[in-house]
UniProtKB/Swiss-Prot annotation:
Entry protein name: RNA pyrophosphohydrolase
Task of the protein: Accelerates the degradation of transcripts by removing pyrophosphate from the 5'-end of triphosphorylated RNA, leading to a more labile monophosphorylated state that can stimulate subsequent ribonuclease cleavage.
Motif Nudix box, residue range(s) on this chain: 38-59
Keywords: Hydrolase
Highest rank taxon of the organism: Bacteria
Record carries keyword Zinc: no
GO molecular function, one term: pyrophosphatase activity
Organism of origin: Halorhodospira halophila (strain DSM 244 / SL1) (Ectothiorhodospira halophila (strain DSM 244 / SL1))
Entry's EC annotation: 3.6.1.-
Cofactor(s) listed in the protein's UniProt record: a divalent metal cation
Family, as annotated: Belongs to the Nudix hydrolase family. RppH subfamily.
Domain Nudix hydrolase: 6-148
Length: 181
């Protein structure tokens, strides 16, 4: 699904541990590392896509994490020209709602091999700002924007708690709860 401007709706997923370090995953068969992310399907909310992609890409379910926050609006990046497909619907980039999650489960629950064709083949914990300089160049600005906007949730007083005080709706902006058509 591509919107009228040529951007594919997508969710970006930042999973943080108790030390505030974030899950960084290597794309299968490549020397490219990134946060988990994935497309939002028709008639699905970004929040629903978050949980589906979380299960598919790193093997975690809703009980394994707490949603700490989400970006207030869609963040966009453009693909380099050489990566734009010439056939089918013309996708020029991605628009993403980013979620910051706290890992509640033991880190051994993180599994990148739970699907037939895994997106990732390795993962590790890195410092919060590390991904900004290490992700592929065309995603850097969006990573910087998402990490900046969500960084306050790591410094919140409830970090030692579950992060779910008030329930998910308390930290999920309307854009992340709207069903895509």
């Amino acid at each position: 699904m591509v919107d009228s401007d040529g951007f594919r709706p997508n969710v970006g997923i930042i999973v943080a541990n108790d030390d505030g370090r974030v899950l960084w995953a290597r794309r299968a068969g490549e020397d490219a590392w990134q946060f988990p992310q994935g497309g939002v399907e028709a008639n699905e909310t970004p929040l629903e896509a978050l949980y589906r992609e979380l299960r598919e890409e790193v093997g975690l379910g809703p009980a394994d994490v707490a949603v700490l926050g989400a970006t207030r609006r869609w963040l966009r990046y453009r693909l380099p020209r050489r990566m734009i497909r010439r056939r089918g619907s013309r996708c020029i980039g991605q628009k993403q709602i980013w979620f910051l999650l706290r890992l509640l489960a033991d880190e051994q629950r993180v599994r990148v091999d739970r699907v037939a064709r895994p997106e990732f083949d390795r993962w590790r914990w890195v410092d919060y700002w590390y991904p900004v300089e290490e992700v592929i160049f065309f995603k850097r600005q969006v990573y910087r924007q998402a990490l900046q906007e969500l960084s306050g949730y790591l410094q919140a007083d409830d970090w030692a708690g579950t992060g779910t005080e008030g329930g998910p709706a308390a930290v999920i902006p309307p854009a992340a709860r709207r069903r895509l058509r």
